[in-house]
Amino acid sequence: LRNNSLAALCPALPEVQSYFRKVTERLIRDYDFDGSKMDYIFSVPRCYNPAHHHKSPDDSVRAVADVYKIILETSKALKPYSVTQICPCGTTPNLAWLPFENQAVTADPVGSIQVRRRIKLYKALLGPRSAVYGDHVELSKIRFDPNREVDLGEDFASTVGTGGVLGTKFTWPDYGNRFDDVFLTPRKEAIWKQWIPIYNSMMLSKGTFMNLYTIGYDSPEGYAIAKDGKMYYAFFVSEAQAWEGSLDLRGLEQGTYRVFDYVNQKELGSVDASSPRLQTKFTENLLLEVSRQ
């Protein structure tokens, strides 16, 4: 499909659906993979092949979801914990196949803002406890050179703080100039070693996304996750921008709460739910754990 160099199987054919069932069985059962990421091919053209005897050329388009359903159900039957992702590569998700993935993908975000807002989008569409992959953290900052895309992102906070599933595409050892932007240098390794344990220990991706802040209206940009009797807040401003003021910690039940900066391991005092305002300052982002005292 890309540059007319690829062909697509017609998903409306029973033979094609059977083929994908067998491929999935081979990958999950025989090769012991733990899931699938369907990348780039998230739709197909209309099919005008008379040998297929379609009632409509759109039969092929409608049947895409049937194939994804087969892949998801076959994977889960073989491995209940398997992950099925569908990546629409920078385009909007298709409502037809959304039910047939168990981990949505933010799909090639260009910068941190798109990571955060697409996570919120998917939480709205799929439910507040749905799993949403924040895509490779390297995509949180991108530079476009004349001949290639250079992925420079290190913004783990935009995925962790919004309740997304963390990911990275670092390379090691050094494979040369083609992958120099994603090579795990000693400097980057220190950052990765800070954030991955934070994600693994807190697992905010399994919490409940609370729709308490409105993008474009509330400033700074805010998110809230409820998990294990605690509230986790994340606030963001533009890159390298400093912010100072009073944060509104919404959604707290009656009582007094301890406020803790869990990234920098810093106590920030306490707030009362009757007036949950926190006077503070930060640069770029601030991630908080708020627990009842």
Predicted regions and their residues:
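Short, well-ordered alpha-helical packing segments
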Residues: 21-28, 65-76
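Active-site-adjacent "subsite" loops/lids of carbohydrate-active enzymes
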Residues: 1-30, 107
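C-terminal beta-strand-rich structural cap/linker in extracellular carbohydrate-active enzymes
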Residues: 269-293
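Active-site groove signature of glycoside hydrolases
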Residues: 19-53
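Core alpha/beta catalytic barrel or barrel-like domain that forms the active/cofactor pocket
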Residues: 1-6, 34-46, 85-90, 131-132
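Composition- and surface-driven signal marking solvent-exposed, interaction-prone regions
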Residues: 60, 245-249, 273-274
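Active-site-proximal substrate-binding groove within the catalytic cores of carbohydrate-active enzymes
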Residues: 68-266, 279, 284
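Aromatic- and acidic-residue-enriched carbohydrate-binding clefts of CAZyme catalytic domains
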Residues: 1-15, 42-71
